[in-house]
Amino acid sequence: MELEVVKYDWDNLIPGLQNNEIDAVIAGMTATDDRKMSVDFTDPYYTSQEVVIVRKDSPLTSITDIQDLKGKTVKGQLNTLYDTIIDQIEGVNHGTAMDNYPSLVNDLLNNGCDAITAELPVAEGIVASNPDLTYVTFKEGHGFKADTSVSIAVKKGNTELLDKIQKALSSISEDERQQIMLEAVKRQPAVNK
């Protein structure tokens, strides 16, 4: 088996599996009940943390609770957990979701919103390539409430590939997985405006 990495728009990942255009999705996808109806998933290989990305010159850099975003405009990536969790903020102005993080970052840098939601590895990559941005984590019990575990998706019924991937994942310790994710963040392409 040979590995070939291809870039797909988020909304085309599951259709790509179903149409045999791609064999597996390794893209920070959570195995939701809805998705499980369309594709099969490995056990989770990583659990992330939800954060918000803000401009460094914003007073939001010091918040510790998602409710501190009340009255602010917050945006997330279209058709992802990171858009739906915004509704956990009481009184938030839930901005229109965007297709990708470069668009969200551009919007944030140009004052189109006050914050964008992301998982920690994505936020680290964005902040590393955008010196005017930072990310905010929340105090224990004061962040978003959502399943942030991610799994690998394969075409529904492709048990042979699913079993091979699961066996490979099972051979990697939790510490090794965390280290692999840290290295992946360092290698990801810059997300600039």
Locate predicted features.
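Extracytoplasmic small-molecule ligand-binding "clamshell" domains
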Residues: 1-28, 37
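Short helix-initiation/N-cap motifs at beta->coil->alpha
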Residues: 4-15, 61, 96-110, 121
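Flexible hinge/capping segments at coil-to-helix
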Residues: 55-73
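A ligand-binding cleft/hinge motif common to bilobed small-molecule-binding domains
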Residues: 12, 28-38, 85-88, 109-110, ...
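Short, Asp-centered acidic motifs that coordinate Mg2+ and/or phosphate
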Residues: 23-24, 114-115, 151
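Hydrophobic residues within well-ordered alpha-helices
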Residues: 17-18, 69, 108-109, 165
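Periplasmic-binding protein-like
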Residues: 47-54, 120, 124, 128-169, ...
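Ligand-binding clefts/hinges and TM-proximal coupling segments of bilobed small-molecule sensing domains
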Residues: 81-98, 134-140, 166-193
